[in-house]
């Protein structure tokens, strides 16, 4: 039997390409499981196999705990230390017992456990093997095609899955076809697929360029950003770290060979290679290619840009179903609003008119000064109150005295507006206090009612149960009781 164990370990290790230690551990687990089935009680068993001789020893063990809940598997610390041995909590006390005989049932049980443990070891090794390739392109052969996914054979008993959303539109494969995709998921689950590949992710595009353009791998050219509408169109932004090299030209290749190779792999996906620029406005202008941008207005606070194009360029700038502007927005990270130059002029004229009326209403200053401020792009009191004073002095045709007056006026108005806001809050708090006179009412519930514009007992009395059921932690019965209490106070009592 000892020689047979060593032979099994050697055979399985060679067949499955697994370490011998993993097979020994699987055998020990199998023998322990078979031994447990020989006993009526639920006991804990450990089996130790001699790695050289193949002989094995069986131990029954108990865990050392403070309070015993499973007498057949646990022992108290006091009992464990009875013989004077040094034992600590969560240690094990072991006792050698007779090893199991290999009858038919024992052999079948051991076989099942070994198969399971070997499979787990294979899956763990597969995860470890492919984890380092996450984010890289790997190649597989179509093994099986299902309705929602494709199973790929990666070789060496490794399989990967491409989900339907990971494929490109109108892409059809047959068993035996060779497919390339980006490995994006390596999962150690005990069941189901462990490796997931995609052809629709943006990383697929960037990795293909990394393969086709040696300068990217050498870090002479850097991919800064990319955006895709898989199978249709993409934009990729590149930057050179060597001023002697044109990054766009290098990615396009001689007669477009490099970009064409990438496009062919992605079912003819149209790819715009654009030059990266650290200036967001200039980068957006580059990203809007092939459309020509007439002017651009940046709103850093809202993280938006208004892009004006000639009316003849509008359709091209927006793209089919908004594709061009959508990809430009994704690759730049800015919200882009495309319009004609006439529309942009009208919009700014309207905004200037609104800002002029706002400042005229809230600032006690000359209209000519307001026109100067609006022309410089100011539209809020906060800007005037908190902009560095030296920047305010740089405004053309604005004297230092006028700048001081503008700043003081803006701060005073903001303080007044804050005071009015506080008064309103105080008034709301007063009405909330009135609601607190009702039995069963608390401050949190009164605040929730105030958020629904219910400030007084009379307003609460006019409500129906359905009006209050969306309030958190308030059920229909409680809502009805509150409403009836309010009605009793308002309608049937002369005082609270």
Curated annotation (Swiss-Prot):
Gene3D superfamilies: 3.30.300.20, 5' to 3' exonuclease, C-terminal subdomain, Nucleic acid-binding proteins, NusA, N-terminal domain. InterPro entries: DNA_repair_Rad51/TF_NusA_a-hlx, KH_dom-like_a/b, KH_dom_NusA-like, KH_sf_prok-type, NA-bd_OB-fold, NusA_bac, NusA_N_sf, S1_domain. Residues 302-370 form the KH domain. Sequence repeats lie at residues 364-414, 440-490. It is found in: Cytoplasm. Residues 364-490 are annotated as: 2 X 51 AA approximate repeats. It comes from the Bacteria. GO terms for molecular function: DNA-binding transcription factor activity; nucleotide binding; RNA binding. One of its GO terms (cellular component) is cytosol. SMART domains: S1. One of its GO terms (biological process) is DNA-templated transcription termination. Participates in both transcription termination and antitermination. Monomer. Binds directly to the core enzyme of the DNA-dependent RNA polymerase and to nascent RNA. This is Transcription termination/antitermination protein NusA.
């Amino acid at each position: 039997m000892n020689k047979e164990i060593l032979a099994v370990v050697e055979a399985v290790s060679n067949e499955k390409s697994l370490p011998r230690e993993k097979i020994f551990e699987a055998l020990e687990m199998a023998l322990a499981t078979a031994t447990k089935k020989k006993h009526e009680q639920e006991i804990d068993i450990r089996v130790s196999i001699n790695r050289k001789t193949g002989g094995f020893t069986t131990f029954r063990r108990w865990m050392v705990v403070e309070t015993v809940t499973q007498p057949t598997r646990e022992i108290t610390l006091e009992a464990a230390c009875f013989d004077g041995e040094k034992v600590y909590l969560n240690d094990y006390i072991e006792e050698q017992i007779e090893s199991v005989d290999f009858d038919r049932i024992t052999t079948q049980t051991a076989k099942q456990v070994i198969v399971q443990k070997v499979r787990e070891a294979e899956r763990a090794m597969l995860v470890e093997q492919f984890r380092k390739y996450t984010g890289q392109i790997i190649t597989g052969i179509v093994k099986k095609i299902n309705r929602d996914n494709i199973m790929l054979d990666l070789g060496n008993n490794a399989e990967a899955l491409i989900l339907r959303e990971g494929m490109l539109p109108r892409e059809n494969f047959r068993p035996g076809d060779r497919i390339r995709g980006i490995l994006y998921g390596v999962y150690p689950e005990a069941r189901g697929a462990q490796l997931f590949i995609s052809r629709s992710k943006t990383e697929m595009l960037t990795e293909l360029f990394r393969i086709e353009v040696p300068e990217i791998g050498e870090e002479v050219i850097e991919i800064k950003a990319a955006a895709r509408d898989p199978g249709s169109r993409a934009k990729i932004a590149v930057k050179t770290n060597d001023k002697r090299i044109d990054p766009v030209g290098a990615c396009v290749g001689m007669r477009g060979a490099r970009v064409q190779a990438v496009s062919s792999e992605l079912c003819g996906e149209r790819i715009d290679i654009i030059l990266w620029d650290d200036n967001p406005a200039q980068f957006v202008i580059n990203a809007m290619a092939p459309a020509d941008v007439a002017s651009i207005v940046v709103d850093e606070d809202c993280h938006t840009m208004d892009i004006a194009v000639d009316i003849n360029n509008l359709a091209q700038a927006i793209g089919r179903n908004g594709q061009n502007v959508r990809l430009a927005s994704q690759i730049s990270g800015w919200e882009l609003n495309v319009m004609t130059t006439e529309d942009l002029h009208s919009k700014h004229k309207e905004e200037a008119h609104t800002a002029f009326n706002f400042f005229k209403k809230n600032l006690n200053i000359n209209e000519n000064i307001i026109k100067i401020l609006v022309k410089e792009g100011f539209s809020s009191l906060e800007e005037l109150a908190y902009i560095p004073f030296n920047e305010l002095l740089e405004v053309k045709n604005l004297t230092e005295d006028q700048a001081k007056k503008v700043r003081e006026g803006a701060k005073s108005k903001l303080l007044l507006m804050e005071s009015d806001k506080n008064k309103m809050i105080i008034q709301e708090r007063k009405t909330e206090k009135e609601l607190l006179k009702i039995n069963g009412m608390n401050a949190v519930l009164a605040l929730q009612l105030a958020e629904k514009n219910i400030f007084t007992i009379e307003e609460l009395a006019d409500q129906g149960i359905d009006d209050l059921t969306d309030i958190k932690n308030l059920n229909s019965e409680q809502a009805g009781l509150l409403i009836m209490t309010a009605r009793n106070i308002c309608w049937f009592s002369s005082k609270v």
